[in-house]
């Protein structure tokens, strides 16, 4: 069952769910809690790579990813990152989130932003039980105009579901967890599959 605003507040109060910095009461409504945009981004660099072989040898795949992804781009508070039509960028939430082994989270973009063409979380919107860290956002501008994204703007909302039982392998205890404890806009680690 999805947690209500009352249950979310209780989970934050008793430490079952941890969101740092803790959101104010105005950020919690209905069945969700707002999250804000952090100041770190990554983009695809200009490159001549004809493709990335997603099922090729890990070493070659990682080399291709290293060639095409930028380093972290830091955007100070008050300044903007511009996402142009047809561009993909990685970003990170301002908040860090910790979930117990019996709660799964879901991240949804804001409808008001989607109506301007901004996809906030292209496909991976599940936050696994046992997650700890910031959430990487996969932005895509499907609109017609560049969009100015500023650190700390409200970018999406998290909602939570309590599971019938705790999972046997919470995310942060799995050796295969590629994005464990992430604190920045981490690029794809598909080569580690």
UniProtKB/Swiss-Prot annotation:
What EC number(s) are associated with this protein in UniProt? 3.5.4.13
Q: Which GO terms describe its molecular function?
A: dCTP deaminase activity; nucleotide binding
Q: Which residues form the active site?
A: 138 (proton donor/acceptor)
Q: What class of enzyme is it?
A: hydrolase
Listed InterPro entries: dCTP_deaminase, dUTPase-like_sf, dUTPase_trimeric
Q: Where are the transmembrane segments?
A: none
| Binding, dCTP | 110-115, 128, 136-138, 171, 178, 182
Write out the ranges of the annotated region (Disordered): 174-193
Catalytic activity entry:
dCTP + H2O + H(+) = dUTP + NH4(+)
Q: In which pathway does it act?
A: Pyrimidine metabolism; dUMP biosynthesis; dUMP from dCTP (dUTP route): step 1/2
Q: Which GO terms describe its biological process?
A: dUMP biosynthetic process; dUTP biosynthetic process; nucleobase-containing small molecule interconversion
> What keywords is this UniProt entry annotated with?
Hydrolase, Nucleotide metabolism, Nucleotide-binding
Record-linked HAMAP family: dCTP_deaminase
How does this chain assemble?
Homotrimer.
User: Which family does the entry's similarity section mention?
Assistant: Belongs to the dCTP deaminase family.
Reported function: Catalyzes the deamination of dCTP to dUTP.
What is the recorded name of this protein? dCTP deaminase
| Species whose genome carries this gene | Shewanella baltica (strain OS155 / ATCC BAA-1091)
> Could you read off the lineage of the organism from its UniProt record?
Bacteria, Pseudomonadati, Pseudomonadota, Gammaproteobacteria, Alteromonadales
What gene does this protein come from?
A: dcd
């Amino acid at each position: 069952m999805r947690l209500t605003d009352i249950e979310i507040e209780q989970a934050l109060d008793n430490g079952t769910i941890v969101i740092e910095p803790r959101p104010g009461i105005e950020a919690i409504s209905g069945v969700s809690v707002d999250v804000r945009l952090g100041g770190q981004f990554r983009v695809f660099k200009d490159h001549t790579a004809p493709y990335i072989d997603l099922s090729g040898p890990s070493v070659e795949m990682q080399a291709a990813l290293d060639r095409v992804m930028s380093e972290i781009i830091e955007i100070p508070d008050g300044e903007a990152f511009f996402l142009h039509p047809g561009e993909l960028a990685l970003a990170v939430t301002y908040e860090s989130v910790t979930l117990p082994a019996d709660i799964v989270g879901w991240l949804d973009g804001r409808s008001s932003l989607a109506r301007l063409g901004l996809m906030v979380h292209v496909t991976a919107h599940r936050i696994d039980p046992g997650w700890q860290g910031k959430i990487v956002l996969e932005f895509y501008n499907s609109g017609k105009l560049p969009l100015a994204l500023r650190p700390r703007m409200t970018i999406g909302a998290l909602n939570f579901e309590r599971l019938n039982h705790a999972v046997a392998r919470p995310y942060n205890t799995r050796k295969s967890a590629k994005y464990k404890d992430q604190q920045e806009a981490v690029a794809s680690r598909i080569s580690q599959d």
